[in-house]
A protein has these predicted regions:
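PAPS-dependent sulfation machinery
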Residues: 1-85
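Short charge-dense sequence patches
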Residues: 12-23, 69-72, 102-113, 136-144, ...
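Short, solvent-exposed loop/turn segments at secondary-structure junctions
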Residues: 39, 91-94, 114-118, 124-125, ...
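PAPS-dependent sulfotransferases, especially Golgi type II membrane carbohydrate sulfotransferases
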Residues: 49-65, 76-79, 122-269
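Short, well-structured alpha-helical interface segments that form or flank functional binding sites
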Residues: 63, 91-94, 106, 113-117, ...
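Flexible, glycine/threonine-enriched loop-and-boundary segments that flank and lead into catalytic domains
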Residues: 71, 77, 81-105
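Conserved phosphate-donor/acceptor-positioning beta-strand/loop module used by diverse small-molecule
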Residues: 88-89, 99-124
């Protein structure tokens, strides 16, 4: 962290507005250890179409899933999990079919949010990573956003199409809508545990309440972003994601408004 702060002054502070990192956030340690922190998309728009095609191809990622499974098998043999292993990474969605091939008994929480809201947010997050390592003024937001648009389409539609063709897997999948999670996170966690028959305790719930109280949204600042900033046309995006958006009841938002949190009187802008 100290080295990065010296090499790119202001980078960590800006990134923390959208994705807080600290020595206590264990998932960040795992992401770095596994080389998983989206390094492959940093400046890949400059790598050409062939790189992009290979990046999102499903079948050639099978060895990666096999290696990961072996890694956790060895880790579990040394230090067995008390209940289960929890893996969190949005890029799993890009290669959704391989999850079930490698982990047949997987219990999967699939999160959903309006893609017209998430796309510029993801662009801003990834821009926060990239821009510190480019020459001043050389970062092309529109060019960079084209790759993020392809990634977003894959992340959304690969699981969506897989589920249409594999209804037998529905018992292993829990759909978590962002608005419901944001408005009442503890209830959603209870539903997840109930669906997958995982033990839920009062002590666990109390720890969640303490965490939520200490980590309210906006604690580390807020990012501002828009579709237009990254060269996106809202109507074009809506048509591209229409099947998915209609299925989950999403429309074109009037403005970027967050849903109302439990205990709040109004939405957060």
């Amino acid at each position: 962290m100290g080295t990065l702060a010296r090499l790119a002054p202001g980078f960590l502070e800006k990134l923390s507005e959208s994705h807080h990192m600290s020595a206590t956030e264990k998932e960040e340690s795992f992401m770095y250890m596994l080389g998983h922190n989206c390094i492959h998309v940093m400046n890949s728009p400059a790598a050409g179409k062939l790189y992009g095609q290979g990046l999102f191809e499903v079948e050639n990622k099978r060895p990666i899933f096999r290696y990961e499974h072996l890694f956790f098998t060895v880790l579990d043999a040394y230090r067995p999990a008390k209940s289960h292993w929890t893996l969190k990474a949005p890029v799993y969605a890009l290669f959704f079919p391989l999850i079930f091939d490698e982990y047949p008994d997987v219990r999967l929480v699939l999160t959903h949010r309006n893609p017209l809201v998430t796309l510029p947010s993801v662009c801003r997050l990834m821009e926060s990573w990239c821009i510190a390592f480019d020459k001043d003024g050389s970062f092309d937001k529109h060019r960079f956003a084209k790759l993020q648009r392809i990634a977003a389409e894959k992340i959304i539609m690969v699981p969506f199409q897989f589920r249409k063709g594999n209804p037998d897997k529905e018992g292993q999948i829990f759909d978590c809508l962002y608005a419901e999670l944001f408005s009442d996170p503890i209830t959603i966690v209870k539903k997840i545990y109930e669906k997958f028959h995982i033990r839920y305790t009062g002590e666990f719930e109390q720890r969640m309440k303490v965490y939520l109280e200490d980590n309210k949204q906006g604690k580390y600042g807020r990012h501002k972003y828009s579709l237009e900033e990254y060269g996106f046309d809202v109507q074009s995006l809506y048509q591209e994601f229409k099947e998915y958006m209609d299925h989950y009841g999403y429309g074109i938002p009037d403005k970027m408004v967050r849903p109302v949190a439990l205990g709040s009187e109004k939405a957060l802008g």
